[in-house]
C-alpha cells in the first residue's frame, strides 16, 4: 500500500517530536504521576501504547480473548484519555494510538476497546464533547485466510519452518482465526481524519512511528 499524505507538514520550524509511551503493554499499568509529569514537560504530539504480544502463545488468538484483565486495560485507558482531554498545549491535542487491541488484535477486541474509549470520553468529557470526538478503528482479521494467503510463501520470524500456503492444512476452516500484522500505512491514513486510532494486530513500532512519519 502506498500512501501520500495530503496534510501540510505541521512543523515548519523543526522541534523534537514528543511521544508519551505509557507502558510496555496496555493493561500492565504505569504510575499516573509519571504520565502527568511527562504530559506537563512540554508539547506532546502523540500518546501511544501497544497492547499485543506473542509471548502468551496462540490460545488468546484462537479464542479471540485478551490476556490482560479488562479492568486493568480500562484503568490505563482512563489515564490516557483524561490526559488527551485535559491537554493544554501548546498546539493542538496530541494524537492517541493503541495497537494490537486485546493482545491478539482480533476484530472483537478492537470493538471492545472502542466501546470502552467511547464510554470514557462520555464519562470524562460529557455527551457533547464525546460526540464531537470521532474514533477510528483499523481491523486486521482475515475472514478468508485460505483465499487471501493461497499459494503464497510463509516466511518464519524465528527458528520455525516456513511453508507453502497451498497445502491442504490451510484450506478454509470455520474455526481458524488469522490476523495480518499491519504497519504504519493504515494507521497513517486513519490519523489523517481523527485524533484517536484503535488498531487490530499491529507491528509494535508502527503505533509510535505512524504520526511522526505522517507529519514528515
Which ranges hold each PLM region?
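Metallocofactor- and cofactor-centric catalytic cores in central/energy metabolism, strongly enriched
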Residues: 2-157, 167-181, 186, 190, ...
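Glycine-rich anion/phosphate-binding loop at the beta-strand->alpha-helix junction
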Residues: 180-216
